[in-house]
Amino acid sequence: MECYRCGVSGCHLKITCSAEETFCYKWLNKISNERWLGCAKTCTEIDTWNVYNKCCTTNLCNT
């Protein structure tokens, strides 16, 4: 599986996940508007007043 990942040029770098990493995630700090994207072995979806985290299991779904 591939996911987008944040890098020096923004969050557009595509990476291939390891066999153990079955989730793509998109994590957003709602206060600072910073975001992180990548692969994960486990993932918990969160939507609170200050944090949003989306998990997905298909290629390049964390845009």
Swiss-Prot record:
Compartments it resides in? Secreted
Q: Does the keyword Secreted apply?
A: yes
Q: Which domain of life is it from?
A: Eukaryota
Q: In which tissues is it expressed?
A: Expressed by the venom gland.
Q: Which InterPro entries match?
A: Snake_toxin-like_sf, Toxin/TOLIP
Its Gene Ontology cellular component terms are: extracellular region
Task: Give all cystine bridges in this chain.
Answer: 3-24, 6-11, 17-39, 43-55, 56-61
Keyword Secreted attributed: yes
| GO molecular-function terms, A-Z | toxin activity
List UniProt keywords, sorted A-Z: Disulfide bond, Neurotoxin, Presynaptic neurotoxin, Secreted, Toxin
Q: Which family does it belong to?
A: Belongs to the three-finger toxin family. Ancestral subfamily. Orphan group XIX sub-subfamily.
Q: What functional role does this protein have?
A: This toxin is described as enhancing presynaptic acetylcholine release, but neither experimental results, nor references to other sources are available.
| Name of the protein this chain belongs to | Bucandin
Provenance organism: Bungarus candidus (Malayan krait)
